[in-house]
Structures are given as structure tokens and as C-alpha cells.
Amino acid sequence: METTSIRLTIRNLPDHFDRTRISAVLDEIELALLEERDIHCSTSADSFTITIVVPTLRLVDVATCLKAIGLI
């Protein structure tokens, strides 16, 4: 299965995400994708970015979900 990595800058997260609790943000992203679109993903973060690895064939669904929660 081919995957696509989506990278989001932490400093550009919307205000309703707590930038001081990145692990909670990652959990929220994973939960939204799983519950709303049945998409399993992998998330990680470093000091500057959040990385979301998703199946390439589900990229449109991922984008729709991320838009709904205010990330894109």
C-alpha cells in the first residue's frame, strides 16, 4: 500500500488546538480520521511539524476530514 505524508506546522495550528499538548493533538487527529472516515493513520511530531501518514488512495477523504477539524 502506498502512503502519503502530510506535514503541518505546529505554529500554524488553529487556536482550538493546544500547542503545549502535541500528543493530545496527534490523538485528536488520529481519532477524527478513524471515527469520521475509517482511516487508519500514523502521526508523529518534532519541534516544528506534525506528520500524518495516510493511505494515498484515501487522500481526498483525509483532506475532507482535516478541513472539517480546521487543520487545512
Model segments located where?
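Residues in flexible loops and secondary-structure boundaries
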Residues: H16-D18, T49, V60
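Short Gly/Ser/Thr- and Asp/Glu-enriched loop/turn motifs at secondary-structure junctions
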Residues: T43-T49
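Short amphipathic alpha-helices in soluble, non-transmembrane regions
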Residues: A24-I29, D61-L71
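Short amphipathic alpha-helix segments
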Residues: P14-D38
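Short glycine-/aliphatic-rich beta-strand segments at the starts of folded cytosolic domains
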Residues: M1-T20
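Helix N-cap motif at beta-to-alpha junctions
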Residues: V53-D61
